[in-house]
Amino acid sequence: MAIVSSSAGRADSQPPAAKSRVVDASPLPEEASPAREDGLRPKRLEDYIGQRELKQVLGIAVKAAMGRGDALDHVLLYGPPGLGKTTMAMVLAEELGVKCRVTSAPALERPRDIVGLLVNLQPREVLFIDEIHRLTRVAEELLYPAMEDRRLDLTVGKGSTARTRALELPPFTLVGATTRAGALSSPLRDRFGLIQRLEFYGLEDLQAIVERAAGLLRLQLTAQACQEIARRCRGTPRIANRLLRRVRDVASVCGGESLIDAALVDEALTLHRVDARGLDASDRRLLDLLLESHGGGPVGLETLAAALGEDPATLEAVVEPFLLQLGFLQRTPRGRVVTGAGRRHLGWPELP
């Protein structure tokens, strides 16, 4: 039960924002809108490339719900940013033949914000909440009966005049997306019937995504050019599409070539300082500092952050994860260490 007149702050604090990077998986300001002008988002499950197990599970759930004439069960999608959680929510709505109402947890700071969304839902509609781990406690309490019993419990008034009012809600589907599934409270997480993780994409799927996006942008790329973009996008479709747009910019300025080849892709992405493995200037600065000034480590996080002029939380949350994923960096009790693979990539000899 929740009090309508209550207000509360945001549920958690976020790490300081890093400088804008072309290989950042988080959406840039111009990419924040779910509906972009270039229309690169797939609209149906059959157009959604990759995530085969996820598509199979959700496809069966959609067909079953439509067969019953009921709303799809509530869905929680989690995983790293840029893998298609928002897109999947919109695809589910399209498959169900209903609207998808899109919002994010920080926009639902006041109880009346989420109440307004819930009472205006039409039968079987999809409500998508991004960053759902950032919901306030009051917003979560409003969602509990809404998700479980399709009912909104409101307390109107204060003190001795307070009274409880229950509003019946139509059947609806809540799709929550988060990069931090562990930050969700257990009561909220337990109310989702389908909890699915999105994985990083393989090279073959990424190449298919680049080919599809190139067609929608009316670009002609060789297979090698598509593969070159796929190699550098960190397993993330959002980054792949962003790199493709940067390649388009260079191609149009360099004479508007009708066919974009791998050499032009390399030229364009080298201009943006993205190397053959997807590392950018920030990644290489960290590795270079460790190698040139500290013999490859170990070096503490605070020391690295001070030397690089970065916030420690930003360094740990934004720069390091991809280096760890590639096996170029290792976290040890004594600090950060460049691995043999990291040394080879930067052209340094391995330690004996």
From Swiss-Prot:
Q: Which residues bind ATP?
A: L40, R41, G82, K85, T86, T87, R191, Y201, R238
Q: Which gene encodes it?
A: ruvB
Q: What are the top taxonomic ranks of the organism? A: Bacteria, Bacillati, Cyanobacteriota, Cyanophyceae, Synechococcales
UniProt cross-references to SUPFAM superfamilies, sorted A to Z: P-loop containing nucleoside triphosphate hydrolases (SSF52540), Winged helix' DNA-binding domain (SSF46785)
**UniProt-annotated stretches for the region Large ATPase domain (RuvB-L):** 13-201
Q: Where is the composition biased (Basic and acidic residues)?
A: 33-42
Tell me which residues bind Mg(2+): T86
Give the UniProt family note: Belongs to the RuvB family.
Q: Which GO terms describe its molecular function?
A: ATP binding; ATP hydrolysis activity; four-way junction DNA binding; four-way junction helicase activity
Supply the name of the protein.
Holliday junction branch migration complex subunit RuvB
Q: Where found in the cell?
A: Cytoplasm
> Region Head domain (RuvB-H): which residues?
276-352
